Amino acid sequence: MSGTTREYKLELQDEIIIPATREKVFEALNDINILKECIPGCEELSREKENELIAKVTLKIGPVKARFGGRVILDPSKAPSAFSPSGEGDGGIAGFAKGGADVELIESDAETILRYTAKAETGGKLAQLGARLITSTAKKLSKMFFERFLRVMSGEIDLKK
């Protein structure tokens, strides 16, 4: 095998209706306790600076289980109608992942339509797993995040335990 580094890029888009006002949704998407509850595999999440988070996440992607240490930058410049988080994580021998999202929050009566486009790039062993596995895993993780987020926003998950 050659010494070249393999990389894989993907893009996901979706729209979710959340039973809360736009301001509450924006606030929740920036709440460290809510994010920690919703991010699949999140073990640690802390605020480094006002708009910068440090995370440790363990994920299994196909046969590869990796613990990522990473950083997320939150860009609240268009708050509360939109924001653009971006980040990168290093999974050691498993490789790396980096990406970002453009998130739009649209008011609709007492609900909010959350529309996003996320782009990600993986490298190392992760990229060698193939496009189909990486894309299906990314979709699954995204679905898990938003299912948990909806449960938190609807009060089904109580973070004040």
How would you label these PLM feature ranges?
Residues 6-8, 47, 62-66, 93-97, ...:
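A generic structural micro-feature
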Residues 89-137:
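Beta-strand/loop substructures that line and gate deep hydrophobic ligand-binding cavities in soluble
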Residues 25, 29, 35, 74, ...:
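Hydrophobic pocket/interface hotspot
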Residues 9-15, 52-54, 67-69, 82, ...:
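Intrinsic-disorder/low-complexity, polar/charged segments enriched in Ser/Thr/Lys/Arg/Asp/Glu/Gln
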Residues 46-89, 144:
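Glycine-rich portal/gate segments that line the openings of hydrophobic small-molecule binding cavities
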Residues 126-161:
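A conserved amphipathic terminal alpha-helix motif
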Residues 1-52, 56-60, 161:
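Hydrophobic ligand-binding cavity/cleft-lining segments
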Residues 14, 43, 69-76, 99-107:
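Hydrophobic/aromatic beta-strand elements that line small-molecule binding cavities or substrate pockets
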